[in-house]
Each structure stands twice: as structure tokens, then as C-alpha cells.
From Swiss-Prot:
Family under the similarity heading: Belongs to the Thz kinase family.
A Pfam family hit: HK
Primary gene name: thiM
Function according to Swiss-Prot or TrEMBL: Catalyzes the phosphorylation of the hydroxyl group of 4-methyl-5-beta-hydroxyethylthiazole (THZ).
Disulfide bonds: none
Keyword ATP-binding part of the UniProt annotation: yes
Binding site for ATP: 116, 162
Known pathway: Cofactor biosynthesis; thiamine diphosphate biosynthesis; 4-methyl-5-(2-phosphoethyl)-thiazole from 5-(2-hydroxyethyl)-4-methylthiazole: step 1/1
Protein name: Hydroxyethylthiazole kinase
Alphabetical list of Gene3D superfamilies matching this protein: 3.40.1190.20
Catalyzed chemical reaction(s): 5-(2-hydroxyethyl)-4-methylthiazole + ATP = 4-methyl-5-(2-phosphooxyethyl)-thiazole + ADP + H(+)
Record's keyword terms, sorted: ATP-binding, Kinase, Magnesium, Metal-binding, Nucleotide-binding, Thiamine biosynthesis, Transferase
One Gene Ontology molecular-function label: ATP binding
Amino acid sequence: MQNAIATIKETNPIVLTVANNVTPADVANGLNALGASPMMSQTPEEADDMVNIAQAAAINLGTLNPHQRGEMEAVMEAAKKYHKPTVLDPVACGATMYRLRVVTELLHQYHFTVIRGNAGEIATLAGVEWQSHGIDAGEGNADLEKVARLAAEKLGSVIVLSGEVDIVTDSTRLARLPYGSPAFKTHVGTGDMLSSLIGAFLATNDDAFDAAVDAVTTFTLCGQAVEDQRPGNWYPGLLNNLDAVTDQQLAAWQ
């Protein structure tokens, strides 16, 4: 990581997020704290204009519905048109046949620069047997590095597999990032925040693998460094750390 955080704080990249209905404020506050500029839309008719002025786009399947799917497709068409990097968060894609069908069709139609999910979600995309548990990772016996590499090879995207140790791979390069905290599980929406924060790093780095590694490292270390890890105090501390963090501070935490 070389001045990645400083670049975001100086350039304020706009990240368009097609959010779910549960965590949009968390996503917006996380982006804003780091120094990026959050933008959200639920209207397919303005997707072209929104993507044109944004530096990256993130799509979240959290509260999937037919209208949201139309917005996703409009955003991805515009991202292809304007050559903007994109992030997919395939929330609970293995939980229902409807979600699996939608995400399969999206991945057939469009290429995503980065895909971030938990073990169950990434295993589903890789075609590996896994017992999903709603939005949570669930259970499985597969080697997670192999699962992530398989998904990257299959989809041609950088894969971020979130867990106790986060895995980032483009199928050739692979990073294991052991900077997490149990507190992340206590606040619904931290995964959504990370997916959109990856967009901010993609906006300022043409190497998608490096950008994803930088994003995961920054976010997880900011969470790990919060002194009070109790749920009610940890989340404000996470935002405070995202706001105050510098490249030098991050290096010291590592």
C-alpha cells in the first residue's frame, strides 16, 4: 500500500451504490468517513448519468426485488459504456433459487471487477457444495483458498472471501489478511460497507487485486484497532478510525 488512503482522502472518489434496504446509511457513512463520496440511486432512468459522474459502482443483492434488478442492469450497462470498475456483493446468493438465478444471470451478462462475499456466497458462485445459512457464511469442508481461486478463475474477477482470515485472489495472486475482529459479526452491514469501500480503492488504483487488498486491510485494521469492542461502542469507533486513519497509521497497526 503506497499512499492509497491519502489518495482517497485527497480525491474524494464518487462511489455509486445500488444498496439494499437495510444498511444504506452504514454504507454511506463508511464511505464518507474514509474520504470518498457516497451516491445512491433506486431509479434505472438515472443510472447512466449517475455512473457517468461516479468513479466506481457497487451492487448489493441484500433486499433483492424485480425493480432493484432493473437498476442493477442499468448500472452495469452504463459501467460497461463508461469503463467504470464495479463490485458485486452477492448477498445470500445460495439461500434461495430466485437469488441464485438472478446472480447467475447477472454474471452471465456482465463482468464485475471485484466480487466480495462470505464463504457460502463465494462457494455458491464457484459451484462448490456448501450449506448456506441465510446471510451468514454457513458451513462447509472445502479449502477456502481453493474455493476463492476457483471462483476467480471461473468468473474472471478479483474475489474477496470474507471470514476470520480474509482471502483476496485474482486466481494467480493470493493474499491472506488476518486482521479481522469478532466485532464485525455484531453489526449488520459491515460486509456491505466493505464492498462499497472496495469501490473507492478501485477508483484510485488500476490494479484491482492491489486495490482489494488495500481496502480489506484498511477496513479490517480500522475495526481491529477500536479500543472498546462492545457492539454499541465498536461501530462509532470504526467510523472514527476510518475518518482518522492514514497510510502511516495503517502501517503501524500491521
